[in-house]
Design a protein with these regions (language model features):
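PRPP-dependent phosphoribosyltransferase catalytic core
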Residues: 3-9, 140-210
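Conserved acidic residues
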Residues: 63, 121, 151
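Short, well-ordered alpha-helices that flank and scaffold nucleotide-derived cofactor binding pockets
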Residues: 51, 55, 77, 81-85, ...
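Active-site-facing substrate-recognition patch
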Residues: 1-61, 202-210
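Short glycine-rich phosphate-binding loop at a beta-alpha junction
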Residues: 61-70
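Short, glycine/charge-rich flexible loops or terminal/linker lids adjacent to PRPP-binding catalytic cores
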Residues: 77-124, 134
Length: 210
């Protein structure tokens, strides 16, 4: 399956939304939104995409698949499942990083006893959509702080030209790379033209509540 085929899978489930004013988690604005939540409704689609995500890696090369909440929970499960389908022995585990609920700077951490499965292990970090790579970078830093070896970062979509240098100098693999125009709020032409901010998708509601 080539990039066109994968993009068609995104389109078929309504995961590509255009013609509105979106605010990304990173705080940047755009007229295009990759609605990853639309993908998670379709288990067959997510399974097929995760199978593609782990193709570059040998099964025995990955001990644990890690994803940040919330989407990373689903991705880590399916990615580990498909790695285990190819393994001849042993097991690849799937765990997720949570975000602290206290304080303004909500950092990722491993709760529920998951931290014990990181040290000395080869880790594949999975993410749905990369814009700045900030969440993935935080997870990578936490994994390294616990003594894990990050083999790579694998994503469904790289929409922000995220490079290895942006995420701690690890390999970045993405099923599709989309070159989208994004803007800082102060430079956003949609804001200047008073295009209403979409409050149903993205972080528009939080942006307007500031």
């Amino acid at each position: 399956m080539n990039d066109t085929g994968i993009m068609q899978m995104f389109s078929d489930v309504g995961a590509i939304v255009t013609g509105s004013h979106f605010v990304y988690t990173s705080g940047r604005h755009s007229s295009v939104y990759i609605n990853k939540d639309a993908l998670y409704l379709h288990t067959g689609t997510i399974s097929a995409l995760c199978k593609r995500m782990i193709e570059p890696f040998k099964p025995e090369q990955i001990d644990v698949v890690v994803g940040p909440v919330l989407g990373g929970i689903v991705l880590s499960q399916w990615a580990a499942h498909h790695l285990n389908q190819r393994r001849t022995g042993g097991e690849t585990l799937a765990i997720y990083a949570e975000k602290a609920s206290d304080g303004r700077d909500k950092q990722f951490f491993f709760g529920r006893g998951y931290a014990q499965y990181i040290a000395g292990k080869n880790i594949l970090v999975v993410e749905d959509v990369l814009t700045t790579g900030g969440s993935a970078r935080q997870v990578i830093e936490v994994v390294r702080g616990l003594g894990g070896n990050v083999v790579a970062l694998s994503a469904l979509c790289n929409r922000g030209r995220v490079r290895p240098a942006d995420v701690g100098d690890v390999m970045v693999s993405a099923l599709v790379s989309i070159d989208l125009d994004t803007y800082a709020p102060e430079d956003c032409p949609l804001c200047r033209e008073h295009v209403p901010v979409n409050t149903e998708l993205g972080k528009g509601k939080s942006f307007l509540a500031r």
